[in-house]
């Protein structure tokens, strides 16, 4: 039957509220966590007996293979669980993060959205077993969720890759569209510069594959400590690391966080050296320096090859200060700017002239460094 030509083209679809939201608005959700909480809240308001929900997305990341968001009705909170390479292959079913967590809340109904093996998985836990009609409604939700999840998965994949290779700060800038050459931001922060001692000799005596594994182990200890105390790794340069602890409140908080990160990195490297010794391998001595100042974090480079990098007097100073570790026979050096902001016991080492730095620098160290 032919429809009248003057029939309005925007006739409303007779869809339940949650499905209408999936069609009209869900694709613009700022993140998977907000998407899951919003969808769960709408299903709950629509009468479904939910205790919680879980959403799993595959991500193209060197280490993380899946991200699972877990929503609990009782608190409204959304938490995140990571699946790593070498873990369970299936993102759904018993043994997966989403299913096992939901099973603690109540009866589980789980749906794959799309084709395996990398399809999203959406699951729900009930306060009681889902009836046939309720189960059918959840299956219908799984069908309507495909389009907005495709958009979310694409954004999550891009974010994962950018964060893995650029770091959080640069990834956020690129995603926000601030990728034009010559742009940057001034950041006041506690700076950490660290690198391995005798790296050139070690690399000449070590097979390339073993050298890569050694660097990975070293970077894991340093970057892990930096991230654990709220810092961010800006650069890996050869065997070196440049990290910052941005000043968001009192400068002393950033300095204390940087000092705690150095302590954690030293502890991690001590365990690594013990493991290497048991394998008949040499230890990995390193030097680290801390300074407080302003850096310019900018997008610079050639017209067809850009990079985010940190420049400024503070970067130069912390790099030169780290180079003083070997001459002074110390593994950790701290500038006077950091020493003035911390209550951590430090040992003064006097004023030192740093190459390329106009004014002498007051240098301190840790008692056991």
Regions found by a protein language model. Give the residues of each.
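Helix-to-coil/beta transition segments that act as allosteric "coupling" elements at the rims
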Residues: 97-121, 125-128
């Amino acid at each position: 039957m032919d429809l009248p030509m003057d029939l309005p083209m925007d006739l409303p679809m007779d869809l339940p509220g949650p499905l209408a939201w999936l069609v009209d608005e869900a694709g613009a959700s700022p993140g998977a966590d907000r998407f899951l909480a919003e969808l769960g809240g709408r299903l709950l308001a629509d009468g479904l007996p939910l205790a919680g929900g879980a959403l799993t997305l595959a991500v193209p990341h060197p280490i993380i293979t899946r991200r699972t968001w877990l929503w609990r009705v009782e608190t409204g909170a959304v938490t995140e669980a990571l699946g790593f390479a070498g873990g369970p292959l299936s993102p759904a079913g018993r043994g997966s993060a989403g299913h096992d967590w939901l099973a603690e809340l109540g009866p589980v109904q789980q749906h794959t959205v799309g084709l395996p093996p990398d399809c999203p998985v959406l699951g729900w836990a009930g306060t009681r077993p889902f009836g046939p009609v309720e189960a059918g409604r959840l299956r219908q939700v799984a069908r309507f969720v495909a389009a907005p999840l495709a958009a979310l998965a694409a954004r999550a994949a891009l974010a994962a890759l950018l964060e893995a290779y650029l770091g959080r700060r640069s990834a956020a800038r690129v995603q926000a569209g601030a990728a034009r050459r010559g742009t940057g931001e001034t950041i006041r922060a506690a700076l950490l510069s660290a690198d391995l001692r005798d790296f050139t000799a070690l690399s000449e005596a070590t097979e390339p594959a073993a050298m890569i594994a050694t660097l990975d182990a070293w970077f894991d200890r340093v970057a892990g400590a930096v991230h654990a105390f709220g810092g961010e790794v800006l650069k890996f340069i050869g065997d070196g690391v440049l990290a910052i602890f941005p000043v968001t409140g009192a400068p002393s908080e950033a300095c204390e966080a940087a000092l705690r990160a150095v302590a954690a990195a030293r502890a991690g490297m001590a365990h690594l050296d013990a493991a290497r010794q048991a394998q008949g391998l040499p230890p990995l001595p390193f030097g680290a320096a801390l300074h407080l100042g302003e850096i310019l974090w900018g997008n610079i480079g050639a017209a067809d090859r850009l990079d985010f990098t940190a420049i400024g007097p503070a970067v130069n100073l912390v790099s030169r200060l780290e180079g003083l570790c070997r001459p002074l026979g110390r593994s950790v050096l701290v500038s006077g700017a950091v020493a003035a902001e911390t209550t951590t016991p430090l040992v003064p080492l006097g004023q030192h002239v740093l190459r390329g730095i106009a004014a002498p620098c007051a240098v301190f160290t840790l008692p056991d460094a």
